[in-house]
Amino acid sequence: MLSIPEDKVEQYCDDLGGFLNSVESIQSVNTENVRPLHSILEDTQLTLHFEQTTVNQDHEHILDHSNNVQGGFFTVPKQISSHTNSQKSNKNNSIDDEF
């Protein structure tokens, strides 16, 4: 069961009503003489090429392609997230505080 804050119920109902109206509008389209489309590329000739993987042991050469390297690894920006009830109960599982 979903838990919706009381002050958000009206907004959620409006949003859901909008989604349902959109679905109803789509379902009302006459598709009687429309051929089913299995892929957007079904009428396009695809040129296949041979792909080959290689093992690259030159770790430093790979890291040279980035400005964000520290200690021999790529670095990424810290992710800041809002704390929800599940995050508060799992404080030990949060890696955000480690970096």
From Swiss-Prot:
Its EC number is 6.3.5.-. GO terms for biological process: glutaminyl-tRNAGln biosynthesis via transamidation; mitochondrial translation; regulation of translational fidelity; response to differentiation-inducing factor 1. Residues 78-99 are annotated as: Disordered. InterPro entries: Asp/Glu-ADT_sf_sub_c, GatC. GO terms for molecular function: ATP binding; glutaminyl-tRNA synthase (glutamine-hydrolyzing) activity. Subunit of the heterotrimeric GatCAB amidotransferase (AdT) complex, composed of A, B and C subunits. Belongs to the GatC family. HAMAP family: GatC (MF_00122). This is Glutamyl-tRNA(Gln) amidotransferase subunit C, mitochondrial. The gene is gatc.
